[in-house]
Amino acid sequence: MSLVPSFFGGRRTNVFDPFSLDVWDPFEGFLTPGLTNAPAKDVAAFTNAKVDWRETPEAHVFKADVPGLKKEEVKVEVEDGNILQISGERSSENEEKSDTWHRVERSSGKFMRRFRLPENAKVEEVKASMENGVLSVTVPKVQESKPEVKSVDISG
């Protein structure tokens, strides 16, 4: 059995195997009529990593969930001076022909997320780190210069 979801064969269910019985999904194939027989959840694979973007007084902080990936499999780039791009790829496993697969749910494939950074971003000082499947990207902000206020003595 292939590790790649079946796009033309529909579900992989064996009625004699209690571990392969799927629960009926009334929305299965709802978004992809006519394209394939594959459920929408199978073709989505690993297309998008979930990303949080928060702004602090000092920086823009991005956190991306990339479970199971090593830092060598993820790229963080700044394009065109203000586009933060986070991308990566999860490779598929080698399948053993002698194994009997009961369920294939983990996906493989590429993902890419792009964010337009605001003008106050210091793109030359971007830092990234990864821990426990969470990528953290910190983009420092340009410190706004506060207008200097000078008191003027009033004569008279």
From Swiss-Prot:
GO terms for biological process: cellular response to hypoxia; response to heat. Residues 42-156 form the sHSP domain. Keywords: Cytoplasm, Stress response. Induction: Accumulates after heat shock. PROSITE patterns: SHSP (PS01031). Pfam families: HSP20. Gene3D superfamilies: 2.60.40.790. One of its GO terms (cellular component) is cytoplasm. It is found in: Cytoplasm. May form oligomeric structures. Binds to AKR2A. Belongs to the small heat shock protein (HSP20) family. PANTHER family: HEAT-SHOCK PROTEIN 20 FAMILY MEMBER. This is 17.4 kDa class I heat shock protein. It comes from Arabidopsis thaliana. The gene is HSP17.4A.
